[in-house]
A protein has these predicted regions:
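Positively charged n-region of N-terminal signal peptides that target proteins for export
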Residues: 1-6
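C-terminal motif of bacterial Sec signal peptides marking the signal peptidase cleavage site
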Residues: 16-19
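Subset-of-secretome marker
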Residues: 22-149
Length: 149
């Protein structure tokens, strides 16, 4: 009975410690609108390791001084570079007054070598250790983003 109780308490202790360290959290950063583009970045992370990052950009045709057709001509080649890269999910939709671009990066599945070649994706340091939430936050805040709480 003592042995069973001891094993049970050890199991509960290990389970408790594992559950404490595995909390998945989210942080969202909003960029100040520049050049007719509203940008929001959302990070999902565990500890200091970023699991996913989602960038949502809303591009106003009027603010850029272009038409919907001109936006398509300019953005279609950009959207092609995201195709066939494991870990990237890219969607671009055109509405009447704006285009909405959404890019989700799953760092657990990402083909880092291919992703590094894409314009706008910046991966510094040793990616085999994962992407640091702390460093990501410092980077986006240095670029004018503010955390949305």
């Amino acid at each position: 009975m003592k042995k069973f109780l001891r094993v049970f308490l050890i199991f509960i202790g290990v389970f408790f410690l594992a559950s404490c360290g595995s909390k998945i959290e989210t942080k969202t950063f909003v960029g100040s609108p520049q050049y007719g583009i509203d940008s929001t970045l959302t990070y999902t992370y565990q500890g200091d390791k970023v699991l996913t990052q989602t960038a949502k950009n809303i591009v106003s045709y009027d603010k850029l001084g272009i038409t919907k057709e001109e936006a398509k001509t300019a953005l279609e080649p950009v959207s092609k570079q995201y195709e066939d890269i494991k870990g990237l999910d890219y969607k671009l939709t055109y509405e009447d007054k704006q285009a909405i671009e959404k890019l989700t990066i799953n760092y657990e599945k990402l083909d880092y070598d291919k992703a590094k070649k894409v314009d706008g994706i910046q991966i510094d340091g040793d990616s085999s250790k994962g992407i640091s939430m702390k460093k990501s936050q410092e980077l986006v805040e240095s670029q004018g983003y503010t955390e949305q709480k």
